[in-house]
From Swiss-Prot:
This is Ribosomal RNA small subunit methyltransferase G. It comes from Vibrio campbellii (strain ATCC BAA-1116). It comes from the Bacteria. The lineage of its organism: Bacteria, Pseudomonadati, Pseudomonadota, Gammaproteobacteria, Vibrionales. Keywords: Cytoplasm, Methyltransferase, rRNA processing, S-adenosyl-L-methionine, Transferase. SUPFAM superfamilies: S-adenosyl-L-methionine-dependent methyltransferases. It is found in: Cytoplasm.
Length: 211
């Protein structure tokens, strides 16, 4: 068993997540591809694949039990984070991964092909220019500096009545919550336990206020 797989198993054992043999292999395969492509294309500032397991894989998959609905878009996905790990964890749900940079989308398409992911679609577009035929149950991102930017730039993406925004943040973002636009409200703030990650992690679930 590879050092990556051994380390991944150790980390997962510190959570309540149920992760199958196939999913573990796919998560390791994703890290191996990210490490390989990163050397040429600079997709992430994290250089050590063992560190990627904590900062990219575990940091993403701890969200997998908090996904309401079936259809999701990961905005500003970069090299596929959190979208690829979440798609691996939730093969019955559909994920669209959006980024404006071609090299990132090419990488994601390679991952999808290599790992045989049937539930991921990569889209190269700026978020404000992307007009989906069908709206989403959840709009995910860990890329936005502010939640106000996230909800304003992505306001056209969630389903009108039931769609939510899912923002992955570090410290509890009280100051950001105070600055949210009038039409947006915080449904829940969930403290996430990421094994061996320094610092706090929170998932903020936001929705449109009911008229």
């Amino acid at each position: 068993m590879s050092a990556l797989r051994t380390r991944l198993d150790e980390l997962i054992a510190q959570t309540d997540l149920e992760v199958s043999e196939k999913q573990r292999e796919q998560l390791v395969g994703y890290v191996e591809l990210l490490d390989k492509w990163n050397k040429a294309y600079n997709l992430t500032s994290v250089r050590d694949p063992l560190e990627m397991l904590v900062k990219h894989i575990l940091d993403s998959i701890v969200v997998s039990t908090h996904l309401p609905g079936e259809r999701f878009i990961d905005v500003g996905t970069g090299p596929g984070l959190p979208g690829i790990p979440l798609a691996i964890m939730n093969p019955e749900k559909t994920f669209f991964l959006l980024d404006s940079l071609g090299k990132r989308i090419r990488f994601i398409k390679q991952v999808v092909h290599t790992l045989g992911l049937k539930n991921v679609t990569a889209i190269q577009s700026r978020v404000e220019e992307f007009q989906p035929e069908e709206k989403f149950d959840g709009v995910l991102s860990r890329a936005f500096a502010s939640m106000t930017d996230m909800v304003e730039w992505c306001h056209h993406l969630p389903k009108q009545d039931s769609g939510v925004f899912l923002a992955l943040k570090g410290l509890h973002p009280k100051d950001e919550i105070d600055l949210l636009p009038e039409w947006c409200s915080v449904t829940e703030v969930i403290s996430l336990a990421v094994p061996e990650l320094e610092g706090d992690r929170h998932l903020v679930i936001l929705s449109r206020k009911e008229n």
